[in-house]
Structures are given as structure tokens and as C-alpha cells.
Amino acid sequence: MSLPRIAVDAMGGDEGVRVMVEGAALARRRHDRFKFLLVGDEARIKQALENHPNLRGASEILHAPDIVSGDEKPTQALRRAKTTSMGMAINAVKRGEAGAAVSAGNTGALMAMAKLALRTLPGIDRPALSALLPTLGDNDLVMLDLGANTECDARNLVQFAIMGAAYARIVNGLDAPRVRLLNIGTEETKGTDSLRDAATELKALAGDLALSFDGFTEADKLSRGDVDVVVTDGFSGNIALKSMEGAARFVADLLRRSFSSSLRSKLGFLISRPATELLKHHLDPNNHNGAVFLGLNGIVVKSHGGASALGVANAVAVTARLLEENLTERIKADLARVGAEAIRTSGRSGGKSKSSAAREDGAA
């Protein structure tokens, strides 16, 4: 069966064409059924392809005269969407010339372009940015939203949970992902009205969906591996994500400094090197690269701007997996299963929840 192409914004990211093309070539070795649409400066892409014969015959170049800069405002980037590599990659998905787009460019611009060009799925009010985070368990943690929406009501959080669960079923091979809401405590009385209303709604909907809703979790428990999907608003999620990244860098720097402090420490490093290399691999963001904009009529994946070729390859591999497993159609099916209106309502945070409506009907 012919699989849709993956459009790669070859000009995005800190390292530009060389790393993006090399990353696509590495991913091609793992997913050799996929072909690529490389979008950007044609001459520079052709030059980069000379070192990757496995990709040359499996890709087409779409010349784009402009790029989106890292500090460009989304409104400005939108006006140039028809001529930039990022905008043209997303529009290729819109036109059906590619099944998904991958970019390491400006996150705000990518979000704005993707939302405008692809629109949200029926039953989804806002797309969410989701990523895989390392844990002590067997699987990575799916966490969303990580910055696309700074404020969310209960309705948004429930929609995020449904999308995150669909994502976790694919990337971690789970039948019924364990879903929790990020909160300042695990007690049912803790948190905002939006969080408590979302919890009530998810309890009511869990039976109709292949997920297990486990209530609330706290930020210090995200890495334990006892939950598969954590849902939050983009403001809290972005802070939690960057705190985890900062903690990982702190541990790595502390180990490096400790092992170089004396001759005995250096000898200790040599003895413990296998363990420290394993730790380094586990904490390396390149091994968990590829944040997905969930809730759109198409797949858009954001690679870290400073990702290595291996990191880009992992982002492309995530994209390929989501295309193979029909993520968008799975989310649509889950939304249809519960009914769009069932998750477009919420209690105190804006409307009546399914459970609240039932109580009122009973009282009447």
C-alpha cells in the first residue's frame, strides 16, 4: 500500500539544511516505505542530498524562496506562508500532496500556520502541543498541552485527554492508557473549577473510551512511570516541561563536575561509565524529539530547533508512526464514540457537564 509523503521543512532549525536532510535520511532507513517532500532552497537541498543516496531516490524537492526566522512574529509569518519553507510544507498537507509536515522552525509561527491551513477536527476547539517525556517506567509519558494554549477550560482539557490517549495507544502500544490531570494535589477538592469539572467529565466518559482516568497527579510525580498521559493547560505544561529539562541539565552538569573534581573521581567515572552513559542516553532530548500538534486535520510535528540529525530522525520516525497508525482517524473515531456535544460542554468553567446535566434532569 502506498503511504503518504512526509513534507520536511528543510530550512527550519538552528543547523538548517544539512541536519534536516541527514535526519530524514536516517529516518528513511527505519521507515523505508515512506517518501519525502523536501521544502526549501533547491540548490542547498540538492547539495545536502549528495551525501545521502538512500534519500535521493525517495524524495522530491519543492523550492521555497523564503524562510521563517526564529524571532518572527506569527502574524508576520502568516502573511508569508505561501513563500516560506514552513508555510509551503504545511500547505502541501492541506492540498493532499503530503500526509504530514515536520519542522524545526519557530514554534509560534508553526502553530499559527498549521491551525489556519488545516483547521481543527470536528469536536475539537483548540489543538494542543504534545510531547513524549522519559520516565522510570517502560514507556515514555505523553504530556499535553505544552504551550499552545495558555488558558484552558474543562472542555479543552477533556478534549486534550481524548487526543492524548489516542496518541499514547499508538506510540506506546497501550490498550487503555492511564490518564491524569496535572494539579497542585491529588485530592478531589484541589485545583481550579476547570480541573475539577474536567475530572468529573472524564470519569463519566471513560467507560465510552479505551482509557483509564486516574484523577489528579502532581508535577514531582511525572517521571515515575505510573501514568501514561498527563493533561494540563499550556501555561502550566510549558513550565513543567522546562523545569524537567532544567533538572536534567542540572544533574548532567553536576555529574560532570563531580567526576572531574579529583583523580579518585575520574577513576570512579571510568568504573561507572556504563551507568553514566545509560543515564546520558535516557536524558538526551534528541532521543525524545518530536512534539505533535494534536487536533488538526493533518499531522504536524515540531522538532526541537537545536536537534541533532538523530533528533530530527526521531521526530520524522514519530511522524511516520502516526501516519502508519492513522492517528487523525483514530481521534475522529474516539470523538464520534462519545459524541461531539458530550465533550463540548463543561460545568462551572463554561456550560453544563454531562454529569451536571444528568443531575438537573433528575431533579426536574
UniProtKB/Swiss-Prot annotation:
Domain of life: Bacteria
Transmembrane segments: none
Localization per Swiss-Prot or TrEMBL: Cytoplasm
Presence of keyword Kinase: no
Keyword ATP-binding: no
Record region (Disordered): 343-364
EC number: 2.3.1.274
InterPro entries: FA_synthesis (IPR003664), Phospholipid_synth_PlsX-like (IPR012281)
GO MF entries: phosphate:acyl-[acyl carrier protein] acyltransferase activity
Major location category of this protein: cytoplasm
Keyword tags: Cytoplasm, Lipid biosynthesis, Lipid metabolism, Phospholipid biosynthesis, Phospholipid metabolism, Transferase
Residues in the signal sequence: none
Substrates-to-products reaction catalysed: a fatty acyl-[ACP] + phosphate = an acyl phosphate + holo-[ACP]
Pathway named in the protein's UniProt entry: Lipid metabolism; phospholipid metabolism
Gene Ontology CC annotation, any one: cytoplasm
Known function: Catalyzes the reversible formation of acyl-phosphate (acyl-PO(4)) from acyl-[acyl-carrier-protein] (acyl-ACP). This enzyme utilizes acyl-ACP as fatty acyl donor, but not acyl-CoA.
NCBIfam families per the UniProt record, alphabetical: plsX
Quaternary context: Homodimer. Probably interacts with PlsY.
Family: Belongs to the PlsX family.
PANTHER family from the UniProt entry: FATTY ACID/PHOSPHOLIPID SYNTHESIS PROTEIN PLSX, PHOSPHATE ACYLTRANSFERASE
Protein name: Phosphate acyltransferase
Organism: Novosphingobium aromaticivorans (strain ATCC 700278 / DSM 12444 / CCUG 56034 / CIP 105152 / NBRC 16084 / F199)
